[in-house]
Amino acid sequence: MIDITLPLTDIHRHLDGNIRAQTILDLGRQFNIALPAQTLETLIPHVQVTSTEPDLVSFLTKLDWGVKVLASLDACRRVAFENIEDAARNGLHYVELRFSPGYMAMAHQLPIAGVVEAVIDGVRDGCNTFGVEARLIGIMSRTFGEAACLQELDALLAHRENITALDLAGDELGFPGSLFLSHFNRARDAGWHITVHAGEAAGPESIWQAIRELGAERIGHGVKAVEDRTLMDFLAQQRIGIESCLTSNIQTSTVASLADHPLKTFLEHGVLASLNTDDPAVQGVDIIHEYHVAAPAAGLSREQIRQAQINGLEIAFLSDGEKRALREKVAAA
């Protein structure tokens, strides 16, 4: 189902949600950190979703073991490098990796700006080694409150030239976007693109707020948009992209089943929706699974899957020239 003549992208992919189980085991042993299991086979149920979680917050706890072993900046650098290696193995030409530096720093009180620098270094080394193009999106983890998000923002702004966009993720219901208006004003002043997790746990009003008040150019997940016809029209007319993550939305119980997922409806409505993974290591999936298994199960035709692939580059945070160069590179391969 993947069109090999077109660039393959993943623009909603959490770096800190893609820490390999083997790496968790390795770093746990290196830093003498107590883990819930001592072999790869027995560790996987603790760090990977093996059945549907009751809600988003329950799903997010699966990510915690990955960041609990980040006891040094070198460990952060390693997982960033491995994220690019994983992208290359999946056949991705372009990836936007998003990460929450405060979340990664928290367990071992690492310097947040140091985490940002380590991630930048690891991703750069990975791109040079594996030939994948990547951009970084900084996340503010709303779950930890406004002050913690301000610390993350300051750390990201210290490396603003290496960050492409700002995102807001975490507990959407408990910490609405309205709490973070000043944060996003600073991000836009820095010249960053804006994408926001919205309409995943909360309703379409959360998406409207992200667009109108935070300046979102893309929406992460956005499944509740289908509940508001005016919003659907607005998304299509204003070319505001939707970063769809099929398997993730089932695992978080955001959507009941793949057959119920709104991605097909988005595409039929002319919304620029794309296919992405979200947290590959935690979910136990990759981009190939999303195209070959999840998308057909969600009712997408071959042409709709191809359109989602086209949309992935169309709404990527790249210049028109960069998009054209990537298309030409893939076509010539």
UniProtKB/Swiss-Prot annotation:
Q: Where does Zn(2+) bind?
A: 12, 14, 197, 278
Q: Which family does it belong to?
A: Belongs to the metallo-dependent hydrolases superfamily. Adenosine and AMP deaminases family. Adenosine deaminase subfamily.
Q: What class of enzyme is it?
A: hydrolase
> What keyword terms does UniProt attach to this protein?
Hydrolase, Metal-binding, Nucleotide metabolism, Zinc
A GO BP entry:
purine ribonucleoside monophosphate biosynthetic process
Active-site residue numbers:
200 (proton donor)
Site, as annotated: Important for catalytic activity: 221
| UniProt remark on cofactor binding | Binds 1 zinc ion per subunit.
Organism the protein comes from: Salmonella dublin (strain CT_02021853)
Protein name per its UniProtKB record = Adenosine deaminase
UniProt xrefs under InterPro entries: A/AMP_deam_AS (IPR006650), A_deaminase (IPR028893), A_deaminase_dom (IPR001365), Ado/ade_deaminase (IPR006330), Metal_Hydrolase (IPR032466)
CDD domains per the UniProt record, alphabetical: ADA
Which cofactors?
Answer: Zn(2+)
What HAMAP family does the database record attribute to this sequence? Answer: A_deaminase
Top-level taxon in the UniProt lineage? Bacteria
- GO terms for molecular function, please? 2'-deoxyadenosine deaminase activity; adenosine deaminase activity; zinc ion binding
**Which one Pfam family would you cite for this protein?**
A_deaminase
Reactions that this protein is recorded to catalyse: adenosine + H2O + H(+) = inosine + NH4(+); 2'-deoxyadenosine + H2O + H(+) = 2'-deoxyinosine + NH4(+)
Alphabetical GO CC annotations of the entry are:
cytosol
Role summary: Catalyzes the hydrolytic deamination of adenosine and 2-deoxyadenosine.
| NCBIfam families with a match to the protein in the record | aden_deam (TIGR01430), PRK09358.1-1 (NF006846)
Known SUPFAM superfamilies for this protein? Answer: Metallo-dependent hydrolases (SSF51556)
